[in-house]
Amino acid sequence: MTSSLVGSEMCIRDRYEDKLGTYLMQLSMHDLTPDQAKQTSKFLHTISDFERLGDHAVNISKVAQELHEKSRTFSEAAKYELDVLEQALVEITDLTVNSFVDEDLNTAATVEPLRELIGILCNDLKMRHIKRLRNGQCDLNTGFAFNDLLTNYERIAAHCSNIAVAILELDSSNFDMHEYTKSVRKLKDDRYLSAFEKYEEKYDINGYRPKEETEKRIIEPKEK
């Protein structure tokens, strides 16, 4: 999908959010069954986060379009790191959408550990890219684009976390997203830590090897 197509869909999303938000607010003032009230609450608490996911997609498409138009590219190391991070982004969005559609609490509970890892990866990648800039491996223009991507990726993960928390809190009469998230991050039970460790192993950004080093390892005979 091109940048212009992504941008054109932004107007559609904005209209949908306005219309859905108005409808849900009006609906919430009626006499609803407990299940209907829960569903209405879930939609009201997540609609803005879904809309913001679209906004960040627009931002990312603009960065990609600018890189293409100006024939700029990242270093091989930066490409590798972004590829790993983008795989994590695909998984967290899939987990979020699936848990929302299926109201799957177990899947929703795996979103926050991945969000935390994505935040850590974004910080690590920023520091690595600063080092490459200092070493002359990347130029300043691509450095700005790299940071823009990381900012949007981190925000996408945060909105996914908000949606997952809303799903987990669906059965709670006292909805407090921020307090719940703070509590989860503080306690970090065995299930949380297990999920985090799995993601940490799966999305390891330390696997990159320069082309020259890879070729050398292939050519050199193994020691017996």
Regions found by a protein language model. Name each.
Residues 1-7, 11-12:
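Single conserved hydrophobic/aromatic residue that forms the stacking wall/gate
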Residues 2, 32-36:
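Short, surface-exposed helix-loop/turn micro-motifs enriched in polar/charged residues
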Residues 9, 16-24, 36-129, 134, ...:
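Soluble C-terminal extramembrane regulatory/interaction domains of multi-pass membrane proteins
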Residues 24, 29-31:
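Charged, heptad-repeat coiled-coil alpha-helices that serve as long linker/dimerization "arms"
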Residues 117, 144-145, 151, 155, ...:
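Terminal helices and disordered tails flanking the catalytic cores of nucleotide-processing hydrolases
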